[in-house]
Swiss-Prot record:
Cofactor detail note: Binds 1 Mg(2+) ion per subunit.
SUPFAM superfamilies: beta and beta-prime subunits of DNA dependent RNA-polymerase (SSF64484)
UniProt keyword terms in alphabetical order: DNA-directed RNA polymerase, Magnesium, Metal-binding, Nucleotidyltransferase, Transcription, Transferase, Zinc
Recorded name of the encoding gene: rpoC
Species: Desulforudis audaxviator (strain MP104C)
Broad class of enzyme this protein falls into: transferase
Binding site for Zn(2+) 1: C60, C62, C75, C78
Signal peptide segment: none
Family: Belongs to the RNA polymerase beta' chain family.
GO cellular component: DNA-directed RNA polymerase complex
Chain's role: DNA-dependent RNA polymerase catalyzes the transcription of DNA into RNA using the four ribonucleoside triphosphates as substrates.
Official protein name in the record: DNA-directed RNA polymerase subunit beta'
Record carries keyword Cell membrane: no
Length: 1154
């Protein structure tokens, strides 16, 4: 077996026949599998014990040797080695092929590697390999030329004419001979010369051929290894055969495919021994080739081989591919023991760091711990009797269980786990019943509710795992959301409503204006019924000042930490969030957890005491509604009349009608808000942020308003009724369009958003904080992000928690606000904005020079903790989750914007995808390529723009029909400016203005989509992904470097190679920046394991094998695949080598657990 600790890279290559034979434990000669009577494997068959090892531990086939004491002996009767049966998962067999066959990956892949090496078209190659045409291998003294194809007829004619002067053959043997004759060094030199001499298509073809030749040269692979003479047979446990109830067998498809190969191979051997006619042998060889093709990649060429019911059989390639393939099913996601799942219910009495675990579940999960403790405490003599006690659930077991779970955190996970807050650690509390109890405040992070959601529980076993769960994953440490650094564990719904009710004031309430000596007296007066909860009273706060406040606010402030000043205002959800944030920043995790529990108790208590429920009478319909709608109707009739008389067009009529109804809806809403009492529960729920919004109240008590039809166009007939009055049939029908579209959209959105997250994770997974400072001099200047005149994101939000690249000085006083290389804190950011500074130079992930990751200075603050990021933090994954998780909230398809003549602009999720995949946008804007003056003119009925540059150069652009211009005659433009409305093609921008402009453009556009939906994401997450999209450059002229023209190379690799060449006096390579979409960037990574487990598995592995690629195992994914600890967090080498020195004794300190 692999020893996972002592290797740090893994290489893939082509295997020669000798390699395969040395790895193999024996040749599979027969197609038999298992004897149906004895149910034992047949000798020399596909499950043979002599080749693959015994089916039972320490027992040979014939039963002569049983028991572990014969370990390692090979039985003299049956030839089976006495060993563990699990060797049947790792021992390889082989089939010696009677004729060479080609490997379909290298012949059929795009581009065909064999075809490029031999300079043959894939079609010609196919004719030779499948015995349709002959190929000349040695023309001798004839007018034929090497690699010329001959049909059967031509071959016969030339044979008659020239006899044995030339050699021609067909099948894989002929190709094998040609591949053996290739001199790679000579061919490489010829191709380099050709690249210098020719242009156009021929040059491109030469470059592609040189790439393959160089791959073979560097990897020490021989081209002839693409033709197989020995076929490996994978271990039998990986292609199992099991007996079903009815005595029938269920088997893996691979066994069928191997059986076909063995049958055809044995038939071919027999035919060759018999000296059968050429045509029969040829047919058998072709069938063998096809059988091997089907085994390796069924369906790649021709029709796939099907099993019962016309189902294509799953070949070796299919075993690796897709969600059910080896990579994604077994290597990246495994089943976990010590886990369970159950329905969740609310546990309002739990503390923030606790969860309620059902007793039966806890007993099963902690079974080994309980058994060990039972033996240790003397309740049982040995493990066996302890196990019996647990299974029979004796009374003493419960006491031991109570003891065992103390201080032993468990992990709770809710699918879908969209971000790191989807798994958190809690201390379990045993509860009756069979449902897991969840603290109400962690529901937001999990996006959980109690309508039947289920959650999974996992038990961390080792001491290290428990320590990590407690110190890093405990729910009290997950108060901030990693995507924007704001609190995510904040009271919601009934708690918000309760606090709102508690802190609201009611003018004229009983006891208003009374004064009290201190807080206690005021509360006593309330409890005695002298004053009401909401009455404004004066209270002496102990420092001599009388404060006008309400008893409710006094009670609320009792729950506040003394360090936070008295909160004397109506507290809604926003205010609560600010309070939690302030408490966390000033007082830390523990005190915030206590505060949250306090607010939770108060909220529930007063929501109950206030009796805040909804009844029909709470929905009050405004009296003026009829009047307002009457006025609107008469106005619409007037517009209709104008249209009939031909005074306005249909479009104008439509637009004016919609404006009229919108105005009417707005008036009704205003009336409604004026009508509702401030203590009306419906109104309170909406204004406090507990549930619902004004729009929903409007539909309940006002009117439903305008609706959209299936295409998204607004129907100009509004629904005048509201839900309290009830809808007519027509009104109900109109409103179903939107409802159905909403449901369909949600379903699509979830899938699309999940796929986007997967691609983002893949592109950024190896971005880890690797060092403190990369030492770069480069920086990025940031200011407010604007969309026209509207500010999308303010300067202050953009610079908090970032590192200043240069000292930031007050423009008037000259005082230094922040030093260079220092973190910009909240107070400093406020000072910077107050000083009127509009642009700030900060360190950014964009300009970080750290290899395979980023440095602490360029990244800045870790938003999940509010402190500077630690080395080893997997910020790439966090970035991907932060962008992907809100993706589900973004709307789908395109919006029809009123007024723009039929122009759709892509918005929401599709726009984010378009940006990250660097696609050409729909409705593309024309971009100026040079600086100069604009002239708009009409030529032959079409408009065009001409830009006249300073030095006389002119560029013309044709304007597509219906495009709206952003510039006018005589305007001055700079390169990169948009000339027409629409989205800019990022590739054009990269060509014209360079990488920095593209980075800022993509950042701005992605932020714009999220901000429109009211989602806040910190810039740095988007920067991490964009940086990964711009990692590569395309080589123009390789100079004296090792690179090939047109190849994609990492920027840092290019700089390093250029330095090496220049030091040796050579000429460096020149290159141009390229922008890769996230899918392309993921596949262009250094790690072939990561790329293969993402998409296009066979293509990635084919290329990697030919290049003999080495995977340096730097990312997370490739380490998960081979089962090593990930090189992030506590899995980093710098943390792994820490050893505890027991020599120094320190007195134990009492550590309170929450």
């Amino acid at each position: 077996m692999l020893d996972l600790t002592n290797f740090d890279r893994i290489r893939i290559g082509l295997a020669s026949a000798d390699h395969i034979t040395t790895w193999s434990h024996g040749e599979v000669k027969k197609p038999e599998t298992i004897n149906y009577r004895t149910l034992k494997p047949e000798r020399d068959g596909l499950f043979c014990e002599r080749i693959f090892g015994p089916t039972r531990d320490w027992e040979c086939y014939c039963g002569k040797y049983k028991r572990v004491r014969y370990k390692g002996i090979v039985c003299d009767r049956c030839g089976v080695e006495v060993t563990r049966s699990k060797v049947r998962r790792e021992r390889l067999g082989h089939i010696k092929l009677a004729a060479p066959v080609s490997h379909i990956w290298y012949f059929k892949g795009i581009p065909s590697r064999m075809g490029l090496l031999l300079d043959m078209s894939p079609r010609a190659l196919e004719k030779v390999l499948y015995f349709v045409s002959y190929i000349v291998t040695n023309p001798g003294d004839t007018p034929l030329f090497k690699k010329q194809l001959l049909t059967e007829q031509e071959y016969r004619e030339f044979r008659d004419k020239y006899g044995t002067d030339f050699q021609a053959a067909m099948g894989a043997e002929a190709i094998l001979q040609l591949l053996d004759e290739i001199d790679l060094n000579e061919l490489a030199a010829e191709l380099r010369q050709e690249i210098r001499d020719v242009t156009g298509q021929r040059r491109i073809r030469a470059i592609r051929r040189l790439e393959v030749v160089e791959s073979f040269r560097k990897s020490q692979n021989s081209p002839s290894w693409m033709i197989m003479q020995v076929l490996p047979v994978i271990p039998p446990e990986l292609r199992p055969m099991v007996q079903l109830d009815g005595g029938r067998f269920a088997t893996s498809d691979l066994n069928d495919l191997y059986r076909r190969v063995i049958n055809r191979n044995n038939r071919l051997k027999r035919l060759l021994e018999l000296g059968a006619p050429d045509i029969i042998v040829r047919n058998e060889k072709r069938m063998l080739q096809e059988a091997v093709d089907a085994l390796i990649d069924n369906g790649r060429r021709g029709r796939p081989v099907t099993g019962p019911g016309n189902r294509p059989l799953k070949s070796l390639s299919d075993m690796l591919k897709g969600k059910q393939g080896r990579f994604r099913q077994n290597l990246l996601g495994k089943r976990v023991d010590y886990s369970g799942r159950s329905v969740i219910v609310v546990g309002p009495s739990l503390k923030l760091h606790q969860c309620g675990l059902p007793k039966e579940m806890a007993l099963e999960l902690f079974k080994p711990f309980v058994m060990k403790r039972l033996v240790g405490d003397g309740h049982a003599h040995n493990i066996k009797s302890a196990k019996r006690k647990v299974e029979r659930v004796r009374p003493e077991v419960w006491d031991v269980l109570e003891d065992v779970i103390k201080e032993h955190p468990v992990l709770l996970n809710r699918a879908p786990t969209l971000h790191r807050l989807g798994i958190q650690a809690f201390e379990p509390v045993l509860v009756e019943g069979r449902a897991i109890q969840i603290h109400p405040l962690v529901c937001t992070a999990y996006n959980a509710d109690f309508d039947g959601d289920q959650m999974a529980v996992h038990v961390p076993l080792s001491a290290e795992a428990q320590a990590e769960a407690r110190l890093l994953m405990l729910s009290t440490y997950n108060i901030l959301n990693p995507k924007d650094g704001r609190p995510v564990t904040i009271p919601t719904q009934d708690m918000v409503l309760g606090i709102y009710y508690l802190t609201i004031e009611r003018p004229g309430a009983r006891g208003e204006g009374k004064a009290f000596r201190d807080v206690n007296e005021a509360i006593l007066a309330y409890e005695s019924g002298v004053i009401e909860l909401h009455a404004l009273v004066k209270v002496n706060m102990g420092d001599g000042r009388l404060l006008e406040t309400t008893v409710g606010r006094l009670i609320f402030n009792e729950a506040m930490p003394p360090e936070i000043s008295y909160i004397n205002k109506l507290v809604d959800k926003k205010e609560l969030s600010l309070i939690v944030d302030r408490c966390y920043r000033r007082l830390g995790y523990k005190r915030t957890a206590e505060l949250l529990d306090g607010i939770k108790q108060l909220g529930f208590k007063y929501a109950t005491q206030g009796g805040l429920t909804i009844g029909m009478n709470d929905i009050v319909i405004p009296e003026r509604k009829k009047e307002i709608l009457g006025e609107a109707e008469s106005h619409v009739e007037m517009i209709e009349d104008q249209y009939r008389r031909g005074l306005i067009t249909f479009d104008e009529k439509y637009r004016q009608t919609i404006e009229t109804w919108n105005r009417a809806t707005e008036l009704v809403t205003q009336e409604l808000l004026n009508t509702l009492d401030r203590f009306n529960p419906v109104y309170m729920m909406a204004t406090s942020g507990a549930r619902g919004n004004i729009q929903q109240i409007r539909q309940l008590a006002g009117l439903r308003g305008l609706m959209a039809d299936p295409s998204g166009r607004i129907i100009d007939l509004p629904i005048k009724a509201n839900f309290r009055e009830g809808l007519s049939v027509l009104e109900y029908f109109i409103s179903t369009h939107g409802a159905r579209k909403g449901l369909a959209d949600t379903a699509l959105r979830t899938a699309d958003s999940g796929y986007l997250t997967r691609r983002l994770v893949d592109v950024a997974q190896d971005v880890i904080v690797r060092e403190i400072d990369c030492g770069t001099d480069e920086y990025v200047e940031v200011g407010d992000v604007r969309d026209g005149t509207e500010i999308i994101e303010m300067l202050q939000d953009r610079i908090v928690g970032r590192t200043a690249a240069r000292a930031i000085v007050h423009p008037e006083t000259g005082a230094v606000i922040v030093d260079a290389d220092e973190e910009i804190l909240e107070e400093a950011a406020e000072k910077i904005v107050a000083a009127g500074i509009k642009k700030v130079a900060i360190r950014s992930v964009f300009t970080c020079k750290t290899r395979h990751g980023v440095c602490k200075k360029c990244y800045g603050r870790n938003l999940a903790t509010g402190r500077v990021v630690d080395i080893g933090e997997a910020i790439g994954i966090i970035a991907a989750q932060s962008i992907g998780e809100p993706g589900t909230q973004l709307t789908m398809r395109t919006f029809h914007t009123g007024g723009v003549a039929g122009e759709d602009i892509t918005q929401g999720l599709p726009r984010v995808e378009e940006l990250f995949e660097a696609r050409r946008p729909k409705g593309q804007a024309i971009v100026a390529e040079i600086d100069g003056l604009v002239e708009v003119r009409e030529v032959k009925g079409r408009r065009e723009i001409e830009i006249r540059g300073e030095n006389g150069e002119r560029v013309q652009y044709a304007i597509p029909f219906g495009a709206r211009l952003k510039v006018q005659n005589g305007d001055r433009v700079e390169a990169g400016d948009e000339l027409s409305e629409g989205s800019v093609n990022p590739h054009d921008l990269l060509k014209i203005k360079g990488p920095a402009a593209v980075q800022q453009y993509l950042l701005r556009e992605v932020q714009r989509v999220y901000r429109m939906q009211g989602v806040d994401i910190n810039d740095k997450h988007i920067e991490v992904v964009i940086r990964q999209m711009l990692r590569k450059v395309k080589i123009d002229e390789p100079g004296d470097t090792e690179f090939l023209p047109g190849s994609l190379v990492d920027i840092l690799d290019l700089e390093e190679e250029n330095r090496r060449v220049e030091a040796a006096g050579g000429s460096p390579a020149t290159s141009k920046s390229v922008l890769l979409g996230i899918t392309k960037a993921s596949l262009a990574t250094d790690s072939f394991l990561s790329a293969a487990s993402f998409q296009e598995t066979t293509r990635v592995l084919t290329e990697a094998a030919i290049k003999g690629k080495v995977d340096p195992l730097l990312g997370l994914k490739e380490n998960v695949i081979i089962g090593k600890l990930i090189p992030a967090g506590t899995g980093m080498n710098r943390y792994r080598s820490v050893e505890v020195d027991p020599a120094v004794e320190t007195p134990a300190k009492e550590v309170p657990t929450h």
